[in-house]
């Protein structure tokens, strides 16, 4: 008996443990159902049980959005690393180093150019995994670089937003990126080029108050949180209870703040159609590009 308990059973347990890797399954953030990781990846990180759209990495966004094998990421301008010599629980320079090591990204925005539905396009993707996608000087430079590249290539600019707002470690330098990115959007308009924004969960703060809400066409993924201040802050300020679903994509669609809510698997085709229409018609207004169509909801 001791031979069985001390030798055979531990060996069996060890074999069983090795057969089931820790990263084989994951749980949905919304419904808590278990999902096979490879099935979740095939579904573009959309829960097959409840349809919840989980966060996506920069690499995944580029891979899903561009036609296969057509995109190239660009090197972005360098900026001063720590203009204020800021320190909270740790030095800002140390925080950046840790975030870069953890996320394998240089900053909270990446830019690439390629083809979407056969059309040339420039795409900028915000990385929420990098200090909550906060906006600092590097993001401002990245956005300007994306706009300039779009103008150079005479191509539309598509931006995927995901942000907690301005980066407090950069103070006023961070807030200055709001007018800078707004100027970049105006540069695109002056050049007659389409600017399409895809709002993802969450898009808040200074990003919402600047380039995230200036698109010629405003698209959102289902149930994305979109707003400036948080719901509790607003309720404390106005002394009123806010409506159910306030600041969610569907509420904003009903109240005319965005043009359409599109499920993630349908996004590449929708972007290709929009770019084709807007390039062909040489228009900036979403109503003209869509023939005056009504707001679009995701298919059931």
UniProtKB/Swiss-Prot annotation:
**Top-level taxonomic group:** Bacteria
Recorded hits in InterPro entries, A to Z, give: AcCoA_carboxyl_beta, Acetyl_CoA_COase_Trfase_b_su, ClpP/crotonase-like_dom_sf, COA_CT_N, Znf-ACC
* GO terms under cellular component: acetate CoA-transferase complex
Q: What PROSITE patterns does the annotation carry?
A: COA_CT_NTER
Q: Identify the Pfam families for this entry.
A: Carboxyl_trans, Zn_ribbon_ACC
Does the keyword NADP belong to this entry? no
According to its UniProt entry, one GO biological process term is:
fatty acid biosynthetic process
Task: List where in the cell it is found.
Answer: Cytoplasm
**What cofactor requirement does the entry state?**
Zn(2+)
Which purpose does this protein serve, as stated in its record? Component of the acetyl coenzyme A carboxylase (ACC) complex. Biotin carboxylase (BC) catalyzes the carboxylation of biotin on its carrier protein (BCCP) and then the CO(2) group is transferred by the transcarboxylase to acetyl-CoA to form malonyl-CoA.
Q: Which family does it belong to?
A: Belongs to the AccD/PCCB family.
Q: What is this protein called?
A: Acetyl-coenzyme A carboxylase carboxyl transferase subunit beta
Q: Which organism is it from?
A: Gluconacetobacter diazotrophicus (strain ATCC 49037 / DSM 5601 / CCUG 37298 / CIP 103539 / LMG 7603 / PAl5)
Which gene does this sequence derive from?
accD
